[in-house]
Amino acid sequence: DVMARTISGGQISLIIGVSAMLMALVVGTLVGAIAGYYGGGIDSVLMRFTEAVFNIPQLFLLIVIGKFFAMEISSIELFGRTFSGSVLVIIIIIGLTSWTYLARIVRSQYLSLKERDFISAARAIGTSNGPIIFRHILPNSMAPIIVAGTLGVASAILAEAYVSFLGLGVQPPTASWGNLLVSSYNYLQTAPWLWIFPGLLISLTVLSINFVGDGLRDALDPRTQI
């Protein structure tokens, strides 16, 4: 049934997008926070590492890993459902290659906030670096992190759809919007509904997430409230 598989494929695509971006948020926040707070040599090393990861082509890596390793991983249980191992591969690759811009955002926030008076007061009363990083500075840096993470979900969904359309992403019997599109390739004229609905939902989902991200940026940016 086309409707059932489209709905099921949407769940997979959204799970991949959200899970990959959560992984990217964790890695990017940790790297950016440590680099921005400590500065100096630590900052230089972490930023050079970030630049190296940034130069890794995400789609090329997804294609190569999907081609040679996705089928070797057994099915997994996630959120009460069974998925092919290719889902886990895509989540990990997207998550580990999408954190670089988040790290730069977090670093810039920490470089600015660590010199504020409330941080100086926390140091004066003997607060250690860990609580300052995660309890004092991080909550004040959440607005741009939330916005960047929201927009990153849309990018992750598009990346999954791209590699799945090439037949190297999510593998059957697990459905995703990307492999629904490739399965309808031979029926473009005779059964257009097979590709119209997955393609339309990908477009609407990505547009909706981008609108949410823009709205969050406007709502959380204090400069727009002046």
What kind of feature is each model-predicted range?
Residues 4-16, 20, 50-54, 111-112, ...:
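Alpha-helical transmembrane segments of multi-pass membrane proteins
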Residues 23-27, 37, 42, 46-110, ...:
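Generic hydrophobic transmembrane alpha-helix motif, especially the helices
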Residues 14, 18, 61, 88-92, ...:
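Hydrophobic alpha-helical transmembrane segments
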Residues 65-69, 81-82, 94, 151-201, ...:
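Glycine-rich helix-loop "coupling/hinge" segments at transmembrane-helix boundaries
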Residues 4-37, 205:
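Transmembrane alpha-helix signature in integral membrane proteins
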Residues 18, 22, 26, 30, ...:
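Hydrophobic alpha-helical segments of membrane proteins
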Residues 211-226:
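Short cytosolic juxtamembrane segments of multi-pass membrane proteins
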